[in-house]
């Protein structure tokens, strides 16, 4: 490449007095009476821009003094140690080439000032240019790379599971249909129902809600696998924690029980939090200053503390006895709400907590039934400051019990014939969990809404770009 990343220069990886070229966008321009302009140039490789000191002796100095926020430039000059506060290095420029101007700078949506989160959502195609979303993007990348690295080091294989599926993993029916049929002229059966045999796949097809079921097939042969990809839920949930399209990390581990995956989940979270604290300290300091003052300290505490563990039944007893008035009543057999989970993590245990062995009637068909006949080997990991961050279970490996559960939930066994085959041919105990990646990024950065930690959020009524 003919230019260097600004991050390389600011980390001191390039010798002082070297001739360097950087390319990026103008953050700010300041002109002095001494005939010198100071350009803050940013290329997205790190939080801070680098300052270019531009003398009026340049042939195109008039162009330089016309630069505004957002203009793209190529700057060549000598890298020197900076005498000014706030930066370690700067460039004494001997050439500035304007690559792209900003039309109508006064109306530039990302002018150099603070913008509200709501405003940035309305300009999602330009918001990566801001300090906040730029920092979110780098932290998100760091977390994703750390997740892949963790599983690689643990001997897991990354499996790419299908986006288009005919299976409903959760059995909830909140799925997006995929079809090439003419919506204005649908083919009908003799019963007046849509004839999906005429569709592209010859049957109903949907966007996946989870890669888990497909992942189990590979765990049943490769022992340790994980998926990391987009998932889709057609939930009518307009909250700060829900998206219609989001990314999931889903490991599946053969010859493993609930305790094994609870331990794996704890190891993974601590690994990726350490990575972001070490690799993206500059961005995390920004979040601690501008977004969530405990952004760094709570991750450090998370890494140091052992996770607490509690059975669902005991958790209900704790909540009932605590004397706190909740918006939603606490009863055995009812799923815990976010307020209940956060009380347990933030006030009772004051640590991340694994809640396990939930009532079978509120959990999915594939979760292993416990010996009491009332609960399943399921778990949620709840973190202070956000609530549930991971959900997982030991999978039901006994065919007769799985079949009974499918019947009980009104699910067609023929639709799951391939899944049932795994229990017919060398079945083994196996377990896995799902991590909502956007919730993880929101927790790490302190951003209050998952819509602000994914590039182009998809929510009910909103699919712009």
From Swiss-Prot:
Localization per record: Cytoplasm
GO BP, sorted A to Z: asparaginyl-tRNA aminoacylation
Gene3D superfamilies linked to this entry: Bira Bifunctional Protein, Domain 2, Nucleic acid-binding proteins
Keywords tagged on the record: Aminoacyl-tRNA synthetase, ATP-binding, Cytoplasm, Ligase, Nucleotide-binding, Protein biosynthesis
Name of the protein this chain belongs to: Asparagine--tRNA ligase
Natural source organism: Pseudoalteromonas translucida (strain TAC 125)
Major subcellular location class: cytoplasm
Subunit structure: Homodimer.
PROSITE patterns associated with the record: AA_TRNA_LIGASE_II
Similarity remark: Belongs to the class-II aminoacyl-tRNA synthetase family.
Keyword Methyltransferase among UniProt keywords: no
Origin: domain of life: Bacteria
UniProt keyword annotation of ATP-binding present: yes
């Amino acid at each position: 490449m003919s230019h260097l990343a600004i991050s390389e220069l600011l980390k001191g990886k390039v010798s002082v007095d070297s001739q360097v070229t950087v390319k990026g966008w103008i953050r700010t321009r300041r002109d002095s009476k001494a005939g010198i302009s100071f350009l803050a140039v940013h290329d997205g490789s790190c939080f801070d821009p680098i300052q270019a000191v531009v003398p009026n002796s340049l042939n195109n100095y008039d162009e330089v003094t016309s630069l505004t926020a957002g203009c793209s430039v190529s700057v060549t000059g000598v890298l020197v140690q900076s005498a000014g506060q706030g930066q370690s290095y700067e460039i004494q420029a001997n050439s500035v080439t304007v690559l792209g101007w900003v039309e109508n700078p006064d109306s530039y949506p990302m002018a150099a000032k603070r913008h509200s989160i709501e405003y940035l959502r309305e300009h999602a195609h330009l918001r990566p240019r801001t300090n906040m979303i730029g920092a979110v993007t780098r932290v998100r990348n760091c977390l994703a790379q750390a997740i892949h690295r963790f599983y690689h080091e643990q001997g897991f294989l990354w499996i790419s599971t299908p986006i288009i599926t005919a299976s409903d993993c959760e059995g909830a029916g909140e799925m997006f249909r995929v079809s090439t049929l003419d919506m204005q002229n649908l083919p009908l059966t003799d019963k007046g129902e849509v004839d999906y045999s005429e569709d592209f796949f010859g049957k109903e097809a949907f966007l996946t809600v989870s890669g888990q079921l497909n992942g189990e097939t590979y765990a049943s042969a490769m022992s340790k696998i994980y998926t990391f990809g987009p998932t889709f839920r057609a939930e009518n949930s307009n909250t700060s924690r829900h998206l219609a399209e989001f990314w999931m990390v889903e490991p599946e581990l053969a010859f493993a029980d609930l305790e094994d995956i609870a331990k794996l989940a704890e190891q993974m979270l601590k690994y990726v939090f350490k990575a972001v604290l070490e690799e993206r300290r500059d961005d995390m300091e920004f979040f601690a200053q501008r977004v969530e003052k405990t952004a760094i300290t709570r991750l450090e505490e998370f890494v140091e503390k052992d996770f607490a563990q509690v059975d669902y039944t005991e958790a209900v007893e704790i909540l009932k006895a605590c004397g706190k008035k909740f918006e939603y009543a606490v009863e055995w057999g009812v799923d815990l709400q976010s307020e209940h989970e956060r009380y347990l993590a933030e006030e009772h245990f004051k640590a991340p907590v694994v809640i396990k062995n939930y009532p079978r009637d509120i959990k999915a068909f594939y979760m292993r039934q416990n010996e009491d006949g009332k609960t399943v080997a399921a778990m949620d990991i709840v973190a202070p400051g956000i609530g549930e961050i991971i959900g997982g279970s030991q999978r039901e490996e006994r065919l007769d019990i799985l079949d009974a559960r499918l019947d009980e939930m009104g699910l067609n066994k023929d639709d799951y014939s391939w899944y049932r085959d795994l229990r017919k041919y060398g079945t083994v105990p196996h377990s896995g969990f799902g991590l909502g990646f956007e919730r993880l990024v929101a927790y790490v950065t302190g951003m209050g809404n998952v819509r602000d930690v994914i590039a182009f959020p998809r929510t009910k009524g909103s699919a712009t770009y």
